[in-house]
């Protein structure tokens, strides 16, 4: 494991933080694609869950912009995708009519 700075990942993490702010705090759920707003039971809860997803993903990406290890490119994207799939499944089970 070595410490190096990957500026592209820092920019991507900052974009995730901006989206987390707008979705989680400002409740701008129009930024989320792939759902019908009329079918959502609790839009505030959806915004909070999606905001936490973007915040956690941004923190994970930011951490990985400073620390690199062997196999990082094969491990990190599937972990974030699996986390996202879990959030999507949870939202579809609990928040969609």
From Swiss-Prot:
InterPro entries per the UniProt record, alphabetical: UCP037672
Membrane-protein topology: Multi-pass membrane protein
UniProt subcellular location = Cell membrane
The record ties this protein, via Pfam families, to:
DUF3784
The regions listed as transmembrane in this protein's record are: 5-25, 49-71, 75-92
Q: Which domain of life is it from?
A: Bacteria
What keywords appear on the UniProt entry?
Answer: Cell membrane, Membrane, Transmembrane, Transmembrane helix
Kindly indicate whether the keyword Membrane belongs to this entry.
yes
Chief place of localization: membrane
Sorted alphabetically, the Gene Ontology cellular component annotations on this record are:
plasma membrane
What protein am I looking at?
A: Uncharacterized protein YitR
